[in-house]
């Protein structure tokens, strides 16, 4: 009987310890000066705030976090996250499954880059504005398992095709275990292509353009069976 009470007391103490773990403790665990910086944490791990979050020296702002306990019966550890700052609005669910998969659900994002606040800014050089929704994105370590989402963005013309900016519709999916984003400017064919995100944030972009093809044909006097395309690659961390 004494052993039983000892075990129950220990489990009760452990539950209280876990339940009362402060958000500032989580902030200390997540804080990595090389990539992630967090000024402070308030509340508890299951409901609280991370203040002054920076990722790769870019200010993200304050993040509100709340745990959804009943999702454990669905095999998930699910958290609702939200950010509301000048230049960025984000709200949705992040978490882990009992199998170890990372997931995002019902995430809505609005970006208005280059909005200055207290001498800091969200600096995404080629994006004028962006609005997107990720219905779901499931990742298994380095593999994309399933994804669905869409959005619209106004981007600066990176290819010298037009003097100002282009409005693009884009669509999220998985292909060959990679995250794939198809984008198009619509029926005008001004710009279309896809972005592949691979291991370790490596990406590849391939884009085609009716206007680019016309210019090349004029200069080369060649008739192409397939539209010429522009390809380049890099690391996503270089974009932030």
Per-range role (PLM):
Residues 51-53, 80-82, 133-135, 152-154, ...:
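Residue-level recognition of well-ordered beta-strand positions that form the cores
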Residues 17-34:
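Short, non-transmembrane alpha-helical segments in secretory-pathway proteins
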